[in-house]
């Protein structure tokens, strides 16, 4: 006769043992992480509603084009917080495929959206025509679909179509190595996003560089989190019972990094008025162009004469309200004498008469 297992402190006696970490007071990390994940999920949903509300508040059309990709990004963040519960619950035939498939797919969605945003900012900061919202969204979805194909292929080959318990049956070192190898494409996306964001700082329209900083700093913190959990997961000296704790902590930490260092700063920029320093080249035709000031019709004959005589512009006097022809080298100027009437031949007529 088997004795029933006693429920840990804080859990009901009839609760399945797979869910004991959600309420076990002795293992407080499960309760702490599920609380942070739940709060993060609620905050993400609130951000999604706020994003829909801000659509009519965004005055800059170039910022409005990013809203569909940012909404997709929030869906990925919501999935990251939700996936945390799959790592708090013990590994079995249901949580195993969920972990291996969704971990890479959700992060691929997030980093693909950041990479598409960085590509659009590179054009804007250089004054070029920005990408349309459909192109930005297509880039984000296209980059993330690669990880979907990789994850599906791995699951089909590993489970042999029907064996869903294979992940719990694998040795822990082998399972961790496969898990990390499955995420190589996500690591490439993350590093590519980080280095691409540096190109946003090379441009004349400085108003867009703030958005590039949000992407750069978010990618940097994400890389630090990923390096930490990968190293901890692959160290053989650590007790394998902490694997789920390490992965669930990485999920919660990265989810809050996405919210705190990308979403919230971007939301602060959305309702702001359009600044002249943010104008791309497509608005250049609205700006007045400087024209060369001209004081008359140029005569190439006189211009050529000035060149042949070797006259300098410093010797030219400009007199306002005068004609185009100005006095040059005024020290050698001379006056033309007035015309005088010739003497009449009859002035000496009377004198000639007296002589005769």
Curated annotation (Swiss-Prot):
The modification Phosphoserine is found at residues 303, 344. Pfam families: 7tm_3. GO terms for cellular component: plasma membrane. It comes from the Eukaryota. Residues 336-356 are annotated as: Disordered. CDD domains: 7tmC_RAIG1_4_GPRC5A_D. Residues 57-68, 123-131, 200-214, 266-356 are cytoplasmic. The keyword Membrane applies. Expressed predominantly in normal fetal and adult lung. Almost undetectable or expressed at very low levels in other tissues. The chain crosses the membrane at residues 36-56, 69-89, 102-122, 132-152, 179-199, 215-235, 245-265. Belongs to the G-protein coupled receptor 3 family. GO terms for molecular function: G protein-coupled receptor activity. Orphan receptor. Could be involved in modulating differentiation and maintaining homeostasis of epithelial cells. This retinoic acid-inducible GPCR provides evidence for a possible interaction between retinoid and G-protein signaling pathways. Functions as a negative modulator of EGFR signaling. Acts as a lung tumor suppressor. It is a multi-pass membrane protein. Signal peptide: none annotated. This is Retinoic acid-induced protein 3. Coiled coil: none annotated. Residues 1-35, 90-101, 153-178, 236-244 are extracellular. Disruption phenotype: Homozygous deficient mice developed more lung tumors during 1-2 years than heterozygous or wild-type mice. Its main location: membrane. The modification Phosphotyrosine is found at residues 318, 321, 346, 349. The keyword Phosphoprotein applies. Keywords: Cell membrane, G-protein coupled receptor, Glycoprotein, Membrane, Phosphoprotein, Receptor, Transducer, Transmembrane, Transmembrane helix, Tumor suppressor. It is found in: Cell membrane. Induction: By all-trans retinoic acid (ATRA).
């Amino acid at each position: 006769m088997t004795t029933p297992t006693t429920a840990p402190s804080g859990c009901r006696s009839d609760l399945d043992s797979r869910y004991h970490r959600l309420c076990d007071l002795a293992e407080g990390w499960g309760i702490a992480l599920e609380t942070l994940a739940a709060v993060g999920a609620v905050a993400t949903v609130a951000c999604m509603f706020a994003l829909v509300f801000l659509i009519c508040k965004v005055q800059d059309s170039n910022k409005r084009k990013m809203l569909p990709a940012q909404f997709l990004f929030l869906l990925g963040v919501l999935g990251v917080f939700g996936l945390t519960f799959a790592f708090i619950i013990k590994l079995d035939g249901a949580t195993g495929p969920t972990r291996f498939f969704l971990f890479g797919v959700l992060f691929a969605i997030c980093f693909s959206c950041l990479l598409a945003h960085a590509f659009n900012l590179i054009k804007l900061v250089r004054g070029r025509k920005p990408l349309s919202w459909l192109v930005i969204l297509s880039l984000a979805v296209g980059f993330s679909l690669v990880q979907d194909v990789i994850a599906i292929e791995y699951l089909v080959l590993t489970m042999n179509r029907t064996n869903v318990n294979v992940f719990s049956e694998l040795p822990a070192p082998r399972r961790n190595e496969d898990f990390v190898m499955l995420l190589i494409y996500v690591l490439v996306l993350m590093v590519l996003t980080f280095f691409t964001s540096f190109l946003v700082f090379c441009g004349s329209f400085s108003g867009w560089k703030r958005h590039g900083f949000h992407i750069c700093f978010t990618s940097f913190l994400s890389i630090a989190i990923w390096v930490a959990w990968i190293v901890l997961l692959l160290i053989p000296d650590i007790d394998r019972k902490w694997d789920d704790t390490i992965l669930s902590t990485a999920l919660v930490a990265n989810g809050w990094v996405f919210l705190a260092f990308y979403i919230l700063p971007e939301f602060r920029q959305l309702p702001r008025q359009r600044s002249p320093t943010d104008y791309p080249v497509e608005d250049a035709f609205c700006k007045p162009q400087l024209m060369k000031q001209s004081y008359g019709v140029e005569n190439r004959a006189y211009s050529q004469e000035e060149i042949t005589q070797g006259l300098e512009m410093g010797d030219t006097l400009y007199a306002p309200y005068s004609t185009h022809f100005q006095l040059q080298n005024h020290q050698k100027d001379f006056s033309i004498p007035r015309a005088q009437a010739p003497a009449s031949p009859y002035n000496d007529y009377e004198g000639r008469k007296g002589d005769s």
